[in-house]
Amino acid sequence: MADVKKVATRVSYGGALVELGNERDDFVVLDADLAAATQTGKFKAAHPERFYDAGIAESNLMGLAAGIATTGRVAFASTFAMFAAGRAYEQVRNSIGYPHLNVKIGATHAGISVGEDGATHQCCEDIALMRTIPGMTVIVPADDIEARACVRAAYEFEGPVYMRFGRLATPVINDREDYEFKIGRGVVVREGSGVTIVACGLMVAEALEAAEALAADGIDAEVINMHTIKPLDERLVVASAKKTGRVVTAEEHSIIGGLGEAVASVLAEQHPVPMRRVGVRDVYGESGPAVDLLHKYGLDADGIEAAVRSVL
């Protein structure tokens, strides 16, 4: 996909906030001294009266967002995934999740692709943490178009939402007239009958590339873009598994508690089939160029292709 347009979903997040802010005035944006990196600085420049910086105090950021939400306004709380899901977990759980407030968490710089920032900033556990909070919706958009759509959908959705965005520029794959984003509804981006690949985030583009390589050997892979991890589109997962008989999941996250385990739980209860999970395998990351790290940890088309071949 060398010639395909690439955009980091964190950039899409910042742009979408500005667009939405130009249309609606009933929401605010908050950050924790990372507005340039999370791209919320764009919103600050356009609508300074609706932007709040909590400083390097992520727990306070979430508490402030919760308080604002109790006044009837939607609050977008933005920081790195490591800090949003890690440092501020208690406040997200108790101050936002428990009262089911209208706070939308924009968690950027998620996963191994943070790159040179290293293991301390490469959050590969956030989906697992957020999935366990009752009533929390978890979204991992695959590209620029989907990231922008998910921001608008989150704004319109009643209740807390965790949106996961990346630092690395990734291929735009949803540039088509019939594209539609619905929370909780997965999308079949490639029809197939031999194996199902369920992916999220930047791994969707990698899954499509793997499917093309597999097709050269007569292996017909169906690829599902599962942008919403919670609530999971269980009906689509089961229907595809019944059609293909084999499932591989792919995520830029730990294989513990993420998309893979969510899909495995559904299949174990409703339609067991042979399955493999592509993801970070219970290890910390390390410092290095994002693309090199993704390859090292098997989070690319080659890793997905190998997993598919092992399950056939």
Give the ranges of each region predicted by the language model.
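Thiamine diphosphate
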Residues: 1-164, 169, 180, ...
